[in-house]
């Protein structure tokens, strides 16, 4: 079994790492907040305080981090320690530009695969994420399949690009549902009546996500993803959506909560 280093044990990373342990892979884990590694250590992983130490003997390195800056910082730490023949699977949502930057920095003999995921914490726990794999994923596809079905997207960076497209549609749909519900509130409609009508129409999936429970995708992460999207193309509607989620992320009670909390924030917002 391949030796795997997993860096980033947040809401998504921790359950994903558990699937690798369950499959029998020797696993070394690292997280900026070291205490989060405790449950995985109890389940059989080895933790380290040094990301370079985590990857030194790894056949496969998986990163699931907050965004481009965190990935660049980790790259500075681990690139000198990656051994020839290793695969780095970057699973964070960082956009194709960051993937291209990393590709230019890869040591000889190291393969970079961009493989962000579709789905939230419930699908991560169940092993039913959708994996969008760009680049030469042949050597790690069987490992990625531990997390859910794998879609090969093409050249390096295409997985990251498609993830940005998917997240833009999801976040935009949730914001549109929030505004539709805000209109229903203003017109005096019962919440259940408006919600059921929207759920039965073309926005049914967005309605389900806007009112989802037991999942997690923070408003701060939504801001990061929309920013990446609007920096890549002129997207006037998403620029308005960015304003909604930036306002939600400015509220300390909402910033790290699931985007369903932002829906409530948007509905109550009086300045937009």
Regions found by a protein language model. Give the residues of each.
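Class I S-adenosyl-L-methionine
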Residues: 21, 38-42, 103-107, 141-145, ...
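Amphipathic alpha-helical hairpins
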Residues: 53, 60, 66, 70, ...
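Helical "substrate-binding/catalytic lid" subdomain
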Residues: 159-269
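Rossmann-like NAD(P)(H) cofactor-binding subdomain of soluble oxidoreductases
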Residues: 34, 51-129
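NAD(P)+-binding Rossmann beta1-loop-alpha1 motif at the extreme N-terminus of oxidoreductases
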Residues: 1-62, 101, 121, 151
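Rossmann-fold dinucleotide-binding core
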Residues: 4, 92-168
């Amino acid at each position: 079994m391949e030796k795997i280093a997993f860096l980033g044990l947040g809401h998504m990373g921790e359950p994903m790492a558990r699937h690798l342990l369950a499959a029998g892979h020797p696993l070394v884990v690292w997280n900026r907040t070291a205490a989060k590694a405790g449950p995985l250590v109890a389940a059989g992983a080895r933790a380290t305080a040094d990301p370079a130490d985590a990857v030194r003997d790894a056949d496969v390195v998986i990163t699931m981090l907050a965004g481009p800056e965190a990935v660049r910082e980790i790259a500075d730490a681990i690139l000198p320690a990656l051994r020839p023949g290793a695969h780095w699977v970057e699973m964070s949502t960082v956009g194709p530009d960051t993937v291209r930057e990393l590709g230019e920095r890869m040591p000889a003999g190291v393969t970079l695969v961009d493989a962000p995921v579709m789905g939230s914490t419930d699908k991560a726990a169940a092993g039913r994420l959708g994996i969008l794999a760009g680049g030469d994923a042949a050597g790690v596809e069987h490992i990625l399949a531990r997390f859910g079905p794998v879609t090969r997207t093409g050249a390096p960076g295409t997985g990251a690009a498609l993830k940005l497209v998917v997240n833009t549609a999801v976040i935009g749909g949730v914001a549109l549902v929030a505004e539709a519900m805000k209109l229903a509130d203003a017109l005096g409609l019962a919440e259940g009546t408006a919600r059921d009508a929207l759920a039965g129409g073309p926005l049914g999936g967005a309605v389900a996500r806007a009112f989802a429970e037991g999942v997690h995708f923070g408003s701060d992460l939504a801001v990061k993803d929309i920013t990446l999207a609007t920096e890549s193309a002129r997207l006037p509607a998403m620029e308005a959506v960015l304003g909604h989620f930036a306002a939600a992320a400015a509220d300390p009670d909402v910033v790290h909560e699931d985007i369903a909390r932002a829906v409530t924030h948007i509905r109550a917002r009086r300045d937009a």
